A protein has these predicted regions:
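Charged, low-complexity intrinsically disordered regions
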Residues: 9, 38-46, 50-58, 63-165
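Hydrophobic alpha-helical transmembrane segments
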Residues: 6-18
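Membrane-interfacial helical/loop segments at transmembrane boundaries in membrane proteins
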Residues: 1-4
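Transmembrane-cytosolic junction motif
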Residues: 22-47
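Core hydrophobic alpha-helical membrane-spanning segments
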Residues: 17-25, 109
Length: 165
């Protein structure tokens, strides 16, 4: 009976489709777990705080134009670099059919009266948005690999220092 079941099922395209879909899901899940582990190691090695999921209300992302109600924020790293407090996180965005992306965003705490020179970061390929208490900086639809986080953070902190006053 078991042999007959195998003969029939191995010739069924639905079985093969389910097998490949399951394999793909497992591969993506394992890659995300590995990435989160690398980000956590990066944060711990530098004395930063790491959270796989964090409270979105803390950054008031609902007031930011780049963040949709369907988006999720994951893998947050927070700390201080060159005297500036930051929170780095990954935005998992879904803008409809076949329009999803993940990008790395760095949020800096600023005061409500802080002024930002608009367009100052554009020359570096960076985009930014200011809300009442935060300045958000990112590269368009780019997810920064863990091995590039250190230079990415230093570059953004340096550029933000020149942008705000």
């Amino acid at each position: 009976m078991w042999n007959e079941f195998l003969k029939v099922s191995l010739h069924d395209p639905i079985i093969w489709l389910a097998f490949f879909a399951g394999t793909l899901i497992l591969f993506v899940w394992r890659r995300e777990v590995k990435r989160a582990r690398l980000l956590e190691q990066f944060a711990n090695a530098r004395g930063f705080k790491f959270e796989r999921a964090f409270d979105l209300a803390e950054l008031r992302l609902s007031k930011a134009g780049f963040f949709s109600w369907r988006d999720r924020a994951k893998n947050a790293i927070s700390g201080s670099m060159d005297g500036r407090r930051f929170t780095l996180f990954e935005q998992h965005a879904n803008r409809g059919k076949y329009k999803s992306f993940i990008r790395t965003i760095v949020a800096f705490e600023i005061g409500p009266s802080t002024s930002v020179r608009s367009g100052a970061l554009g020359g570096y390929g960076l985009q930014m948005e200011k809300t009442s208490n935060h300045l958000f900086v990112w590269q368009a639809k780019r997810r920064v690999p863990p091995e590039e986080l250190e230079p990415f953070l230093h570059s953004i902190v340096r550029n933000v220092e020149q942008t705000i006053h």
